[in-house]
């Protein structure tokens, strides 16, 4: 406005002192661009204008008022219906019918956004859908508009010699829309010159009563039920609907299939070596072994996955409604709630499964000891012992929160994958991120493709932050021995935090499920041999490609050491916690320790996986967890030994209870990560060498164990096993596992 005022003060004036309009010619010689000036006062900036009379084959005709005889003149006796489009965007510029006798003219208020109107690649149908807000109103609009063949445009300013560019663009798009969808030889387009308020009332011949009276109307709607009016009211959704929009943004990768389309997009692959209801299978998996029931199997898995999605939506809704209670109120409510009881309406109850398993174990012990000792009567009928504190669900159903993940959005690789508060990994308070070196600056600049990633570490606040996008996973009600950390692929700005998680939790094995092709897609970043971290020293000691004949599997051996941060990394303006001691926000320098990384490159995002490779990965992972020296020695001697841990050796009891957590990541840390954790946990609790801490009968139960595991994992991290393809792959993979077990069993000598 200052620039316009300066032009006004310095511009030419006529003999009466009025401001004269200055004109300029655009790059297209036939378009004259005029800057609008208001005589005798401060100019009102309306944007550039176009002289339509200079355009070749211009089909837009001028009309002085709504009584212009040219509007209704045609070469036939056909009665034409007229639609007046009021393009004024101001609150007092809408017109309406002042007299219902004017049945041949309909007034429609259409204040479309000028930014979208001027986009050449944004057609009128998209403008209309965006303005109306629903496909139903768009369809209704097209049904009504097809009856009109004369269209008058009014923006209360434009003339043929000086038409606003926004109005011109809208008219051109509207003409293309009408001529394409509703072609007619009687189509006419007029521009009403001047304001509707300045236009005299049309007489429509000698009958002065039949008129359209331009009148200001503050409402943005006209009644759809009237013959001569259109309703384009935009209904603003109630506040509760905004929650649904937010939840849909978290589940934006979800694709819904109909039961009839399952056969078109999916097929369920069953190994040929398995017989229907094969005895080698657990009871709950036998329904997937009947080849003739492929449609039924797919439909059941589809329904189960939809149920999982509905459960997750309910949890996310609780994130929006949850109000954190004080600690004393939470403890009081837990005491009042008392022990958890079995609800028959639930799809499954882990507590009930535990009681059944304990009862069966007790019965077996009694049978085995019946000949050796006499069991007192008062013990034979005793009820099962109460569950320990470890048996309780990790998070009560009302305690789901995503607050820290939303607040620390710059540390998330994806905006819709956030960690739950009750299970997220919390770091000790960190100081301000280090100054960016030349090498790290290069890494950071390449990460601009991520909207959630900070472009520069200097932009970080010096406020201590314990956040990392990672969750602890532990299914204590099934088997408490196996612990996982699911996380996203670290960003350049969070690599120090990533290695801090490893050092704090004494992680020995990292499972990386990213392919090299995803590096170009910026789905992950190399977090070793990288200068984006400063508080850790990572030394790559050795690398093996395609280990144990697993194509695309790389084993890397890292030596990890925590180092003291530089003093200049901590700003003097930062508030140190506690007593201001640096040790309260930093880690002490540690002795170097070994971390193994297994990277599997042949698992593309949102796709299935070769179960043979997963079984080998599972065994290699166990070897690195429980017997790393022997396994590394065999690799150094170029001897492939993926079976250092024999699943059939029931005498071999691994120290699973004291094992370190397994850190698993893909890109987002939920899809492929969820599938691997599900399968790894299943293979562990089904193997006699690692299932000695099972709390439920994983063989004889009738409830679907994969459904249970995925649901329990989703209680701890969002979107674990992210889509239907991955969910079906879990069942196919487990069937392949038992088919391989059957082959091994049949190959053994009798």
Curated annotation (Swiss-Prot):
EC number(s) on file: 3.1.3.48
Region of interest (Disordered), ranges: 1-20, 327-348, 425-450
PROSITE patterns with a match to the protein in the record: TYR_PHOSPHATASE_1, TYR_PHOSPHATASE_2, TYR_PHOSPHATASE_PTP
Swiss-Prot/TrEMBL keywords: Cytoplasm, Hydrolase, Nucleus, Phosphoprotein, Protein phosphatase
Gene Ontology MF term list: protein tyrosine phosphatase activity
Catalytic activity: O-phospho-L-tyrosyl-[protein] + H2O = L-tyrosyl-[protein] + phosphate
Broad EC category: hydrolase
Sites of Phosphoserine modification: 258, 430
Active-site residues, Swiss-Prot/TrEMBL: 666
Family statement drawn from the similarity comment of this UniProt entry: Belongs to the protein-tyrosine phosphatase family. Non-receptor class subfamily.
Self-association and partners: Interacts with HOG1.
Protein name according to UniProt: Tyrosine-protein phosphatase 2
């Amino acid at each position: 406005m200052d620039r316009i005022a300066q032009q006004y003060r310095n511009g030419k004036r006529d003999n009466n002192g009025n401001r004269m309009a200055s004109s300029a010619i655009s790059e297209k010689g036939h378009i004259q661009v005029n800057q609008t000036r208001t005589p005798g006062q401060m100019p009102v900036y309306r944007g550039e204008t176009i002289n339509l009379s200079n355009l070749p084959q211009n089909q837009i005709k001028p009309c002085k008022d709504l009584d212009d005889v040219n509007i209704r003149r045609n070469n036939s006796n056909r009665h034409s219906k007229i639609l007046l489009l009021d393009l004024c965007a101001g609150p007092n510029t809408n017109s309406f019918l002042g007299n219902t006798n004017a049945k041949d003219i309909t007034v429609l208020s259409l204040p479309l956004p000028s930014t979208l109107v001027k986009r050449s690649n944004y057609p009128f149908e998209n403008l209309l859908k965006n303005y109306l807000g629903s496909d139903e109103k768009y369809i209704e609009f097209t049904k009504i508009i097809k009856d009109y063949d004369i269209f008058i445009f009014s923006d209360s300013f434009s003339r043929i010699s000086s038409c606003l560019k926004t109005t011109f663009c809208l008219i051109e798009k509207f003409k293309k829309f009408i001529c394409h969808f509703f072609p007619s030889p009687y189509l006419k387009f007029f521009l009403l010159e001047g304001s509707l308020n300045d236009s005299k009332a049309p007489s429509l011949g000698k009958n002065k009563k039949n008129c359209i009276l331009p009148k200001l109307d503050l409402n943005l709607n006209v009644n759809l039920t009237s013959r001569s009016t259109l309703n384009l009211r935009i209904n603003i959704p109630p506040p509760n609907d905004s929650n649904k929009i937010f939840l849909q943004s978290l589940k934006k990768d979800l694709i819904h299939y109909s039961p009839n389309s399952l056969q078109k997009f999916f097929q369920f692959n069953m190994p040929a070596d398995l017989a229907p209801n094969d005895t080698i299978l657990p009871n709950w998996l036998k329904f997937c072994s009947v080849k003739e029931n492929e449609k039924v199997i797919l439909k059941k898995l589809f329904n189960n996955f939809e149920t999982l999605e509905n459960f997750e939506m309910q949890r996310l809704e609780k994130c929006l409604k949850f109000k954190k209670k004080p600690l004393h109120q939470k403890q009081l409510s837990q005491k009042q709630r008392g022990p958890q009881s079995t609800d028959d309406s639930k799809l499954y109850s882990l507590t009930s499964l535990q009681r059944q398993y304990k009862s069966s174990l007790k019965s077996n012990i009694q049978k085995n000891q019946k000949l050796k000792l006499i069991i007192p009567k008062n013990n034979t009928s005793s009820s099962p012992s109460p569950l320990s504190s470890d048996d309780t669900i990790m998070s009560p159903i009302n305690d789901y929160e995503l607050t820290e993940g939303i607040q620390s959005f710059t540390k998330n690789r994806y905006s819709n994958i956030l960690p739950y508060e009750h299970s997220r990994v919390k770091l000790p308070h960190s100081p301000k991120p280090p100054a960016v070196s030349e090498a790290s600056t290069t890494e950071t600049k390449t990460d601009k493709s991520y909207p959630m990633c900070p472009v520069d570490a200097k932009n970080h606040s010096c406020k201590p932050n314990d956040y990392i996008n990672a969750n602890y996973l532990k299914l204590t009600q099934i088997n408490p021995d196996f612990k996982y950390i699911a996380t996203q692929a670290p960003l350049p700005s969070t690599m120090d935090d990533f290695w801090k998680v490893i050092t704090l939790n004494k992680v020995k094995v990292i499972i990386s499920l990213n392919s090299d092709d995803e590096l170009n897609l910026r789905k992950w970043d190399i977090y070793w041999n990288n200068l984006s971290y400063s508080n850790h020293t990572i030394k790559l000691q050795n690398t093996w490609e395609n280990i144990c004949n697993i194509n695309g599997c790389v084993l890397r051996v890292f030596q990890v050491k925590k180092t003291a941060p530089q003093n200049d990394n901590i700003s003097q303006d930062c508030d140190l916690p506690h007593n201001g001691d640096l040790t309260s926000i930093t880690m002490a320098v540690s002795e170097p320790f070994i971390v193994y990384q297994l990277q599997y490159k042949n698992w593309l995002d949102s796709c299935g996986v070769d179960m043979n490779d997963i079984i080998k990965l599972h065994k290699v992972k166990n070897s690195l967890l429980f017997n790393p020296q022997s396994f590394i020695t065999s690799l150094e001697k170029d001897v492939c030994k993926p079976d250092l841990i024999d699943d059939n050796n029931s005498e071999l009891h691994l120290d699973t209870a004291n094992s370190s957590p397994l850190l698993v990541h893909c890109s987002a840390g939920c899809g492929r990560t969820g599938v691997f954790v599900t399968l790894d946990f299943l293979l562990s609790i089904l193997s006699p060498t690692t299932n000695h801490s099972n709390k439920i009968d994983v063989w004889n139960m009738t409830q679907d164990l994969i459904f249970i595991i995925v649901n329990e994992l989703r209680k701890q991290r969002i979107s674990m096993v992210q889509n239907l393809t991955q969910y079906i792959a879990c069942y196919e993979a487990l069937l392949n596992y038992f088919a391989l077990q059957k082959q091994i069993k049949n190959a053994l000598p009798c």
